[in-house]
Amino acid sequence: KINSKAVSAKGANTFKVKGFPNKQKLNNHWQNGRTHAAEYAPDGITTKEQYEKRAVQLLESPCGNGIKGYKTKDGLVCRYDAKKNDFAKGSPEKGVRTMFKPDDGEDYYKRQLELEGIEDD
């Protein structure tokens, strides 16, 4: 379990693991199972490496300029980019958990915030 006090709900966070915890998890998100490859092609993200880099960049970003966010009691960082409809979740210690474009956009973010979100540091 990660110390949620070491994670910023709204500020910038630095990820020690700059990507998914391993190649299999990255591959599972990009091209196997629930594939996100097709979701990101319109954004010009056409490789799993670009997808992974975008996820880390979003998760390390502070809130503002269309980016909303929170942390969880388990020390995960969640960010939602309203302009691009990207929802990402990850652990600064263990890496990216997921990034995708929710079908219902900001409503998905709001539901997740209500379920698990902590907005203060």
Listing of model-derived features with the role each one plays in the protein:
Residues 29, 51, 70, 80, ...:
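Aromatic side chains
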Residues 69-92:
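Basic/aromatic recognition patch in beta-strand/loop cores that engages polyanionic ligands
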Residues 88-121:
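A short, surface-exposed interaction/processing loop segment used at functional sites
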